[in-house]
Amino acid sequence: MTDSTTLVALVLGLLEGLTEFIPVSSTGHLLLAGHFLGFESAGRSFEVVIQLGAVLAVLTVYASKLISVIRAAPRDPQAARFLAAVLLAFLPAVVVGVMAHGFIKTVLFETPILIAIMLILGGIILLFVDRMAPAPRYNDVTEVPLGVALKIGFFQCLAMVPGVSRSGATIVGALLLGTGKRAAAEFSFFLSMPTMAGAFAFDLYKNRDVLDAGALGEIAVGFVAAFLAAVLVVRWLLGYVSRHGYSLFGWWRIIVGSIALAALLKGF
């Protein structure tokens, strides 16, 4: 492990943690950063493990609430329905992810220009939905009906195209379906737990033969950086979107996507 690879691992870990739970596409940012920093050769193991750091971050922040909901579920119909809603929203990603995993990883993930374009388009959509979404009918995350949860799950499948953003797709879907801005972000947090844990396990299984023990140092640096950054973001985001909405992230996507697209078209 050299100083340069450690620094790049730190940068990518921070990037993963800072962007995983805001609607800007952590995968898109990671792939573009890896392309421009020349870190693409680090292998799948690095990407997979640092995302686990982000999963553990949201579990850490929401541990007490998750435990209380699980304990209440046998006697509280609303808690039981909420857990069912999260699991139901998770199912479409399982089906599509298993069926299309090879195409997504070998074709879509290798197209930086597509990622930049999706960042821009997603930013435009996010700005529009943030301003034009219908008045919310579900202002608490536990109020989301099962049918709405399933539809949010189908929105999540759009995020398998890198640059779309898992949190962005689920938040946009939730807003369009009548969920309040804070509740939309919180539902996205809860949905990320089974989705990202499942993606981690599946990717780890698929890439078990290419895990690089020699990269453990970089992986550890990226993992810790992703975990710490994600904890800060999860604790900050709900209060921010309750007051200001999602327009900041829409403009962020458009600016980053435009800069990346211009650089790629110039041959970088």
From Swiss-Prot:
Keywords for this protein: Antibiotic resistance, Cell inner membrane, Cell membrane, Cell shape, Cell wall biogenesis/degradation, Hydrolase, Membrane, Peptidoglycan synthesis, Transmembrane, Transmembrane helix
Molecular function as annotated in GO: undecaprenyl-diphosphatase activity
Assigned EC number: 3.6.1.27
Localization (cell): Cell inner membrane
Enzyme class: hydrolase
GO biological process terms on file: cell wall organization; peptidoglycan biosynthetic process; regulation of cell shape; response to antibiotic
GO cellular component, one term: plasma membrane
Family: Belongs to the UppP family.
Name of the protein in question: Undecaprenyl-diphosphatase
Organism: Cereibacter sphaeroides (strain ATCC 17025 / ATH 2.4.3)
